[in-house]
Amino acid sequence: MPKMIKGTEFIVAKKTKNKKKNHFEDIQTTNDINEEESEAIFGNLYDGADEVLPASLAYENGQLPEDGSIQVAFDADDNAYYISYDPENEIFIEPYEKYELDVSALYDAEGNPFDFFANYHVEGAETSQEEESGEYWEQFVGVEGYGYYDENEEWVWTGYFDEDNKFIPNEEEKPAEVEALEEESEATEEVVEQEPQEEVQAEEVVEEPVSQEQPEEEVAAEEYAEAAQEEYEEQPESEQEGSGEYWEQFVGVEGYGYYDENNDWVWTGYFDENNNFVPDQYYDEDAAVAGDEQVEEYSAQQEQVQEEYEQQPEQEGSGEYWEQFVGVEGYGYYDENNDWVWTGYFDENNNFVPDQYYDEYAQPVSEEQYSESVSEEQEPASEEQVAEEPAQVEEVAVEQVPEETQPEQVQEKVQAYEHVEEQQPEEVFADAIDEHYDEITHVEDKAVEEEQIQTDNVVSSDEINWSNYVGNEDYGYYDENNEWVWKGYFNEYGMFIPQEEDYTDSIPVDEQPVEQTADLAEQNEEEVIEETTASDEIVQVEEEVESEPVVPTVSDDLVALEQPFEFDTQQFVGNIDFGYYDESSEWIWTGHFDKDGKFFDFDGNLVYSPQEGVKPVEVPKPTDLTNQIPQNALVVAEPDVFSEDTIQQVDESQFDVGEELVVRGLLNPASTPVQPQELNIKPVFEEEKLNLPVLANEVSLQPQVDYSKRSDFDQLVTQTPVVLEDVVADDLISVDTKGFVPELSQPTFAPKAVSQDQFKLVQPVVSQPKFDQITHLTDEIKMDVNVTSSDVDVQPIQINPSLEVASEPSKLDIFVKKPAVELKKIEFIEPVSEKIDLQIFEQQEIVTKPVSTIQKPTYTDETVSVSVNAIDETTSETDTIVQVTPTTSEASDFDINKILNTKPVETITVELPKDEPKLVTGVHVSLVDVEAKPVEEIVKFDSPKPSVSEVVVEKEDKLTLVEEEPFFNKFIGNEQYGYYNNKNVWIWTGYFDDQNNFVSDKDSKTQKVDQLIEEFNKQEAIKKTEEVEAKKASEPFYNKYIGNKQFGYYNDKNVWIWNGYFDENDQFVPDQSWTKRSEKLIEDELQKQRIHELELELAQAQQAILESTKLKDQEVAKIKEEVLKVQQEAIKAKEVATLRNFVPKGSPLLNPAKEVENSMIVYQEDKLEVNDLRNELSKLKTQREEFDNFSKIRDLDVINLYNASTSHRGMDYVFSGFEKKEEQFVKKPLHFLEEVKADPVQVAKEETISNLDQLLKQDPHLLLAKKTDKSVSPQASLTVLADQKEVELTQQAVRKQAEAIEAERVDVIKPLEQVQLNQSRSLLDDLTPKFEVKPSLIKDDVIQPKYNDDLEPIEQLQFKQERSLLDDYMPKFDDQGLFSKVEFKLPTVNKEYRPKVEPIDVIKPLEPVRINKERSLLDDYLPPKLNAQPTFEKTELDLGLEKPLANGELYEELKAEFSTTITPADSKDMIDQLLEETNDLITSSTQTRSTKIHSFSKSPLKTEPEPILDTKFDDKFIELDENQGFDQLIVESDDELLTDVVQEQVSVNQIAVTNEEYKKDMAELKQFLEKRSEELFKQYFSKFEELTKLQMESFNQIKNELRSEMNEIRDEVRSNKLALTSEITEEIYPSAPKVSRKQRGVHGFSEPTSEFDFDNSLSLVNENNYDLYELLDRIINYEDVPLTSSNLFKAEEYQAKVKQSVYNIKLILKNSEAEATKNYNYILSTLKNEITLLQKDLPIISSQLNKLQHDLRAKQLNRGDYKFVQEQIQELRAEHANKTRAISFYNKKVSDLKSIYAQQIRKIKSDYKKISDLANKRKVSSDYIDQALQSFETARVSQPNIKRNYEQLYRNQLQQNVNANYGNFRRYDPLIENHGYEYFSNHQPREFFSELESIDNDIFSSNDLIYSNRNTYLDENFRINDYELTSNFNDIDAIYGMDKLRLPPFEPSNLVNDMEFNSSFDIDFDTDF
């Protein structure tokens, strides 16, 4: 069955033509595959079968099938695997586990790439090895039309195969071929009968096309040149792709060729572009004679085929229709058991449907398709011919064809060549032969050709020979990869021809055949190559430029990935249109590139389109690489430095569209090294679509071809004459290029291959060229490349085997991965024009053609051998690459000067002189074509001295049409599209669909599976739905209503009860009785509810009345009791007076909160004995409550004793510096100046004075508001509000000593009182609604209000005031709502029961339905200052707001407070007065709280009325949320801009902008604020870093001086022979940092760290500097040098120096403080200016708002105007809110700045104190170091698991470092001054320290985690998060916006002797820490 097998093999290959390609994977490439890819490709190699004998044992024991069906292969780790071949799927599998293996990753036992088919024998296959692994063209040996057998029974080709495996006949032999055809047809007829039906398959399909095409064979060339254009255009690529080559259908057809003795088909001609068969001109008569028998045999066969074909329709009907196709290639193959295996199936129409693995044939094989598939074979030939024939006409006197060229050889070689190339894209059972065939090395060596012609048969018989020599050192050697490298090659007769000078080094090991068959195949290839060139020379050189169809096999590395345009996006890096650099200098794209290279931003806007050139006529598909392939690249490379290819790309825009580049080459095939003397390439450019990175592919030069009709390519294909040395190993045949003289009257350029790594758009890139002589091209280049083999010093280059040259690479392929090779003896020499004759031709000689006819001319000259120029993507850095990306517009004229001017080295002529053998081993001039086949590195060979061949590239008048090869060929070699199996067969991993889009096989397989599953599921779903429908049909229709409550209900037994019935129309008729019953039930429920509500209201009213009537008597009685108790308990009346006049005067406060606290504390010195009070309270409870807040702290930002500022209100020391970052904005206690806000007030359990503690603790406002004067100035409009801790401490202060408070107490309250009195009184001022504010931290079990509703005195107070319409307004701010059902109708009741009724203390938020209605009432309200309306009556609003007063809480507290010294009569009036004023305060605070506006802190100068919101218009226009009713109560101007942030609270949903606009506004605001403040803080930090650095430098200088001084002392002491203590020595010369003292590594402290660490930079005294302080301390205290009589003098002298050092340090510290303060003042003033500017706008905005709202109220606006005004108002609100936010943000930054500055100053002062102590010989530092540091560092670092005694540590620090921590507060804190810090520490509750102990150890390592790291600070604190922007800004203002921002004055003292710091700077240490 040999023929059958061969045919099967052929068909299989054709089937996978789109998917697979013979190419052996390079080891490197394989290794590069990552694990996922590898597993995806060939499964997990390591999944072995447990139950099967291990493969390694089976291999050792020889327990494997003899037929080779199961073999053993080894991976790189020597793991053994069973492997077998699955011919059906054409994959290698593990036979037991059935998973796929990638043979390219496996090796045989000798370490050579594994070749399965070397040992794979199919039964009955006589030539099995050759067939399975042979070259593609081998199947055509013996095929009529491809050649003939000569008298020696040797096969002579009548043409050659191009790189697409298209057979190109030799035209000159046509006459002979015709004869041969006739003769052979007869012979064939006889033979055909004996041939298996397999060959017939093609013929069956052939008949129709044949009948059409045969007559056209004789048509004149010009005619079918035109026809070719039309017909070719009509035949879309997809059709060719899907159906196989056109010419395939003529294989076996008589007249087209014949079968040789090997049953290989030999064409006797070729197909032109119109698919017309053109007989070979060169057809050899001898061959014809030799092939007579075959011709006859074949003709008979052909007749038989035609008969069968005619009978086919009849047979289709019969049941055995398919039997006729058994044995027909394309339908299946014979397996190893000689059983026929179908590769598809017949559908019901008897159309053959191939399996999915044969993607190309995946369409039903109808008759039409048979013809198509066969035609596929014919296409290349016909295409070639069309291109060639016109070229004949154009031949000028360029055809200097050596006479010795033998047509036979040419023909035979061309035939073989075509076979080879035709086979490449397909999967054939190719052996290692494929690995070693290199199309690029089609070098013309006539002698070799002759040998090959003669020995073709010999080869086949001797195929086994050479594999026996593997391992024989005479024939080669093993390289470092343990791969066999031959020292020569076997010729056609199987004789080993050694290469000179160990050329084998340059042969990749993969080229070394694994089997003899591979070698023979390669020799056949060489044959083909040689013949090709020979015949090409005989033929017109133009025609060979045709090799563009050769382009099919794209190298592995072609950029035709699934994103076809894989251009280099790096060229856009740095372009601000495409992205930006982030902080880490990393480039961030602002969009993405699509597959076409277009750049879109993230919004989808097209930012950049690469279509800068003119669109080509035909836009390629995304998977079509043609537009990406580099245009013209001339590669001149030395073989020994093949990786250093100089690649040049010529910018197509430089060329005229019409210009044509014609390469005419006349090469002497017998001569070996070709030395092109001139290469004049005339460019023909078509407009180009994209300026995208283009792929450069080498293209071998072919004889000139006219490309005028070429409509497919718009890129100039480059032509590269390749000069190789002769005596070529298997795949490289050298050509002597001395005669290679390309000429062109057009300015020439040297195109160069381009590696895809170096693509840049538009910009040509030049990688360092390293050739000996490089001259800039001007308009024309003559290139002499003269190399003789004797001149050449061949340096072998080892090539790894995975991408084998012989694996059917293409001349066009340069994109093959190749290992990086060191360049040897290559220098980049300055341009030398010696040997380069630059001729400038006249432009007039350019012949332009219409643009439409030229698309992508491909210039290839196959007469010139093309070297394998593999440019590895990874190693392409070493390649010299000149890229000029072609961008051609129709109008652009080609001007080579444009190219030359763009870059100095854009065009490079490489001159390789003869006389420098070590520099030149042969010049490879490769042309980069549109597609390139995978090729390995350039391999150098030594060769006999060559004769000269000439290639003349000459301008032609006529443009030749280049035939298009299948588009997919260009993807062969691209790993994204497939891979090479171990046979070097290209395996596609997918297929191309009708749109030429590549569909991944993985996808397709899974898709098909998915489709099957989907269909399965669909069918199941359909079945289910049918079943369901059937069920539904059976079910009553009404079942679907079960469960619908409109139709019934479930009873208690869960049985469905219908509420009605369905009538005959299936309409539901409800049961009337049920409906009525349900309605009645509902009505009853509602009625009950209403009754209940009414009863509730009545009960409430009655209760209020009763309570109010009882109130007076009860309270009088209570007051009497309390007065008696207090009189008994109180010792001095004076003490009570202190309570009455508690507050100090309101002088300008540094920080009012702090001042109050301090003044309170001061009065503790008065000896008020409050032991009784204390005994009343449980101390533990008090402490627990005190630190309630503390225990809730998580995520501490600041815990350090240095910077945790104190709130010393009373005995206890409280950390107020713990803040959660988010809580800063929401829950932080308000320490600063701000408006008064009422906290919920709760009544103490008892009325005794013992509850005063809780009372004070609970609400400090009561204390502050106790005694108010009515004569205070309006300036003090802001009140001090204490937080919980302040209350606690205040209470303690009162407890302790209250005497001293008397004098100043009134003054603090005055501001509060005055504010109220300066406003015209309104009843609203007295309202104190209970709001749901943050709950008091005091435990409920401690304080339980005893009385809820007693406040009769208040009623009297309120009766004095006028009723207001507002009184009826009942705002509902509380969640608990007992008023939810009360209609807004109670004013009459109020009037009636006014004295007695009090509302319940819970106020529920208004129902949304009533909000607008009630707001409308509120809108009439003007604050009393502006329009006090005495006529207003008291209404429900007053009732609601009075609740806290009414329920007696406030009264009880005040009563308890005053009852000690006030008689009952007095106390009533006093309390009334106090309550009145307090109500005023609370009311104001309430309004403010509700409106988020400081409505009461107005300047008396204000004249504008306050804005009033009027919502009486149609609610359709105004949809207000809860807060909006108050939004307009805006303060237009403030007393102090920096003090009051006028904030209009606008919730997000009120801003009438779209969400996007709002986000945009917020983003802009964020960006502005962040940028501005970050600039300032960066400036601040940099200044301080600079200061710190200077400080440290000075410091180090002092330290060094001290050490040198110490050194002198030490020497003197030693000279006096005094004993030195080890301590001294170690301290002076520390051998290593002491763990306890120098934790941070002293040695490195002076180097600035990359991060700014406040801990180490702000303080001179830190762990990095302890050594200096200790040193000073020891020196000062005479510890280092024992004082004796001998060294006393020296010690004193030394002490003087030490004191000078101390002085210097103090000076440095002093200057540091001055600089830090100066820097701080600058930044602070800048921030304040920002705030001021922002605040100036707020009143303007407010006034505009007022005006607009006045217009809304006062004017009757039409609907349009009304809407416009509303929009304006919303915009103003948004602006107001944004500016307010900005102010809040800046205020926060001011606060941060203060915090940082406070740390800095604190540390400087701390250092200063330490130095002062040292100088005064106070041994503080050693105590500090021994104790504090020990507990800090040893516990933290040395023994991190030991729990530290924080309490002891705390006390140590407090005792020993008073000034360091809190010296700044001494003047504020007399208690600290008098009692010392131990007092504080002793009074800290136990929980304080237990909390500390839970803190992470490292917290103490930095002073403040927020600020410990500069970059962290900047990152975290200058990014406004959305939370900040949307949360309650009034809270932020409360924290940051309310305090008066002051510049701390700094008064530098010039008196150095007075080193004490001025204590005048007043940073708010308290609030931020």
From Swiss-Prot:
What processes in GO biological process is this protein linked to?
A: adhesion of symbiont to microvasculature
The UniProt keywords, alphabetically, are:
Cell membrane, Cell projection, Coiled coil, Cytadherence, Membrane, Repeat, Virulence
For this protein, the record's InterPro entries field holds: Cytadherence_HMW-1_N, EAGR_box, EAGR_sf
Report the GO terms under cellular component: attachment organelle membrane; cell projection; plasma membrane
- Please give the start and end residues of each transmembrane region: none
Entry annotated with the keyword Glycosyltransferase? no
Q: Which residues form a coiled coil?
A: 1000-1027, 1082-1190, 1547-1621, 1758-1790
The record ties this protein, via Pfam families, to:
EAGR_box
Query: In which compartments does the protein localize?
Result: Cell projection, Attachment organelle membrane
Q: Where are the HAT repeats?
A: 148-166, 258-278, 300-331, 333-353, 477-497, 959-997, 1029-1067
Q: Which residue ranges are recorded for the region named Disordered?
A: 174-244, 294-319, 365-393
Stretches of Acidic residues bias are at 179-207, 214-242, 374-387
* The keyword Coiled coil is annotated on this UniProt entry: yes
Alphabetized NCBIfam families for the sequence: EAGR_box, termin_org_HMW1
Q: What does this protein do?
A: Component of the cytoskeleton-like structure which stabilizes the shape of the wall-less Mycoplasma. This cytoskeleton-like network of accessory proteins containing HMW proteins 1 to 5 allows the proper anchoring of cytadhesin proteins in the mycoplasmal membrane at the attachment organelle.
Name of the featured protein: Cytadherence high molecular weight protein 1
Gene that encodes it = hlp1
